[in-house]
Curated annotation (Swiss-Prot):
UniProt subunit comment: Homodimer.
Organism in which the protein naturally occurs: Acidithiobacillus ferrooxidans (strain ATCC 23270 / DSM 14882 / CIP 104768 / NCIMB 8455)
GO biological process assignments: nitrogen fixation
EC number: 1.18.6.1
Cofactor needs: [4Fe-4S] cluster
GO molecular function, one term: metal ion binding
Task of the protein: The key enzymatic reactions in nitrogen fixation are catalyzed by the nitrogenase complex, which has 2 components: the iron protein and the molybdenum-iron protein.
Keyword Nucleotidyltransferase: no
Gene3D superfamilies reported for this sequence: P-loop containing nucleotide triphosphate hydrolases
Name of the protein: Nitrogenase iron protein
Reaction equations catalysed: N2 + 8 reduced [2Fe-2S]-[ferredoxin] + 16 ATP + 16 H2O = H2 + 8 oxidized [2Fe-2S]-[ferredoxin] + 2 NH4(+) + 16 ADP + 16 phosphate + 6 H(+)
Modification(s) after translation: The reversible ADP-ribosylation of Arg-103 inactivates the nitrogenase reductase and regulates nitrogenase activity.
Amino acid sequence: MSDKLRQIAFYGKGGIGKSTTSQNTLAALTEMGQKILIVGCDPKADSTRLILHSKAQDTVLSLAAEAGSVEDLEIEDVMKVGYRDIRCVESGGPEPGVGCAGRGVITSINFLEENGAYDGVDYVSYDVLGDVVCGGFAMPIRENKAQEIYIVMSGEMMAMYAANNISKGILKYANSGGVRLGGLVCNERQTDKELELAEALAGKLGTKLIHFVPRDNIVQHAELRRMTVLEYAPESKQAEEYRQLAQKIHANGGNGTIPTPITMDELEEMLMEFGIMSAVDESVIGKSAAELAAAV
């Protein structure tokens, strides 16, 4: 494993556009001459679909189940090579409601390390579900694999709530390992004062807003063709946005911070400061519209 290897991770709540953002950013990094390995750590197994032009890659866990055990697999069975020679692996997870989805993450990373998948690459990128930072999904952080965490969020309250929760997970392991918060990436949802809120949250968490990715329908057009914007429309404004994000991440090595998570009350206070949320009158909690009208 190379001394200069950068191990980064993209975390974010489900549906925030984390996998799309990460794949486009990593594609942009290859234009800068960087060699990339993607390790998908999301049970949806969609962390590599735009790179491989596929619906979903076969996962380490599903292939291991077919073969008998992970020891019966070869690295070629689980690692596929896609756009601009990006190496792709999906860890996978168990059937819904059965077992720990994080188990696939642990199994995959151990298998990849033991079989030389990290050799000759400049970046390993973990794409991780981040609604809950449970033990399994926190594995890239806990085991000191991912050194730089980039949280994909938006100006929506639950996306900011998830970003704060992920920061708590990073803080828990920051002192025992070397993991740091690299910064926030705001994937625009066109909510009120979104840029200002993202910058304010970054300040509260003791980090910075790495990049504000504007909303553009070209992303959806590319996704329908299972392609990154970099491949589908390389001359587009959106492709340039991802190039800028890639350049900022590339220049950010060693600049991560130990996050300073906030409370739910502080998050709500921040929303009130920006006029997104009004102070709540406790006397109206739990009252229906009809009850409130009758009380007038």
